[in-house]
Each structure stands twice: as structure tokens, then as C-alpha cells.
Amino acid sequence: MENTSLRSCRKDGVVYARGATDDKGQLLTHLLAAEAWMKTIGDIPLNLIYLIEGEEEIGSPHLEEFILEHREKLQADVVVISDTSQFGPEMPALCYALRGLTYMEFIVTGANQDLHSGMFGGIVPNPNQVVAAIVAEMKGLDGRIRIPGFYDGVKPPEGWEVAEYEKLPWNDSDLAAQLGLPGLSGEKEYPAPVRRWYRPTLDVNGMYGGYAGKGAKTVIPSIAGAKVSMRLVSGQNPERVAELFEAFVRERVPDDCKVEVIRYQNSPAIIIPVDHPAMQAAKVAFRNGFGKEPLLIREGASIPIVAFFVDTMKMPSILFGFGLPDDNPHAPNEKFTLADFHRGIATSAHFMDVYSEAAG
């Protein structure tokens, strides 16, 4: 069975549909929790605001403007977002930190048109090779990023964080096998959870230029480029990282080529204090909803709107993840188990109860 449709189907206690776990299913848990409360108890002891938008996958280009325009109506004591996951089956988790994101593209231009390599090879620059050389120099095979100043401000995990990730049933070999790899890569002096959550990264997301079709075409391309994402951690300044990246690229483009550097996205890493009253209420809610203590984890991905809520709106944000890591978001057979769906509803209802008491 393969389901890529927006229409859902149910099989063996699992709902399959595009958006089942990312993010319609998780959103629905909070709506149904409020509905169940009103049907069984009556008035909800909190003022709830539901903010639903459909542009998250393209960077939410209008969301910040909308929130600022309606700032007074949307101001809240706490924001609850469900766009993360549990650590694994029967392992509920509260995410207290997200990496930031700086996304860049650079485009190298040589001649004013594609050229024949037999006629012009040896006397004109090849943008493909310029881009390849710059990309190769950015990051070593050991996983170390070579851009000077890139690691400025990066701090190791605190002692309590080490204790938390050491609780996790983390198995490098199993994860590598699941991904079809002989082993995990990266900075081997750091354990995998640290590389995944506490260390910044640089990844080339795409490269283009020249001829990539079937067969041969002896072309020297006029232009070539690369798209690069950098996941940042607390202590790194996204604007500063973007400046360092641009300087690194420009210093390495030869005089016989031109370069354009484009900045697409800059958002800082976020850490939510685990002793915040809303986080403490969330721990109790997960304990009641899932029947076990939630793990405290970080997330290697980025949710830029969280940084906006925290830094601009001054609203603490709590990340409730009810899905599973293998729920296939954005892919065929995206899914959400009904068991986790129902536990998510219960957890959301318990949070309303516990947080309303804590907030007075």
C-alpha cells in the first residue's frame, strides 16, 4: 500500500495521509482536547487562541507580518506547538531546544554563454570546478567545518543535559542500518546525540551547472551554483555566520569569475528553560497522557516561528511532539498512529488542567 493523497485511509490502527503527522493530525489533538473538555466538564479554565497557517513548509513568509498586525489579539502567556515527535515508540519526549538555520546560495558566472570544451578548454574558467573547489574546502571529510570563526560561541552540553541524553536508548549501529549506511559520520570526537543536537552543521543541499542529462555533452558551463544550509546552536549569531560564509566564498572565487551570494533564511537557535512553569506543567501532562515520564530532548531541526515567538513576542514556547520519528513526513505513506493520536488528545487536556492551576 502506498498513500500520497491528502485523503486519509486507516489500517491496523494507523492513519495514512499527507499531513497526518505533519501537521494536521497533531493540530487536531489540541482541538479535540478542547472539544472534549467543553462537552464533559464545561468552560475551559484558560483563554485559548488557535493560530493555524498553511505556509510552514515554504518558510511561513506571511506569518510574522500577520502576528505583528494582530499583536494585541494574539499576545499570550505561553505558546504550544506540535511540530516535533517522540523519541521513539512508547518514549514520549519534550523538546526544549531547536537548532537555528542559515540558508545560503552562491552562483558563480564565467563566460557569457556555455562553451565547447574542445574549443575553449584551457583558456576560460569553469564555474563547475570553482563551485566544487569552494564546497570541498568548506567542510572536511572528518565533519569539521573549515569556515574561520564558524564555531565561535558554541558551547558543550551542560552536565544535566549529558545525563538526559545518556538515558536515551541510542544505538549508532541500528540507526546506521536503518538508513542503509555502514556507520554514522561526522565529528567522531563527539557522541552521536551531541553531533545531532548540540553541534552546528553545514550541508550542501544541491549543486547545479553544466550538462547533467543522458549521454555526453562537452560543455563548459556559463554558470554554476550551490545551495547550503547551516544548522546553528545556541551562542551562534545567524547574521554573523552568514557574513562569514559570504566572505569565505568571495575570497575563493578567482578574478576571471563573478559571484552572487544570496541569503534566504536566518533564524537563531532556541532554548526553552526546563524550569519554566509551562515546561513543568507539560511534564505532568505527558506523564498523565502517556503514562510515563517524558524524556527531555533537543531537536536538530529548526522552526523559525518559535524564535519569533520567543525573541520578538516574548512568549515562551513549548514543543509537544506526539508523532514518531518514522512517521514519514513529506513522503509517501505519511502516518500517525491512533494510539498516539488519542494520547496526544489526553496530554493536551491534562496540560490545560495543570497549567491553569499553575498560572492561577
Question: Locations of the language-model features?
Answer:
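Active-site metal-coordination/substrate-binding segment of hydrolases
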Residues: 1-49, 343
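Residue-level recognition of well-ordered beta-strand positions that form the cores
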Residues: 105-109, 137, 207, 227-231
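Histidine/acidic-residue-rich, glycine-tolerant segments that coordinate divalent metal ions
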Residues: 45-126
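A short core secondary-structure module
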Residues: 65, 121-142
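Alpha-helix capping and helix-loop boundary segments enriched in small/acidic/polar residues
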Residues: 18-25, 57-58, 93-94, 119-122, ...
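An extended, acidic, His-containing surface patch that forms the Zn2+-binding/catalytic region
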Residues: 88-89, 146-223, 231-244, 252, ...
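Short glycine/serine- and small hydrophobic-enriched flexible loop segments
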Residues: 32-39, 133-137, 230, 350-353
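Short small-residue beta-strand/loop micro-motif enriched in glycine and branched aliphatics
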Residues: 15-17, 112-118, 213-214, 329-331
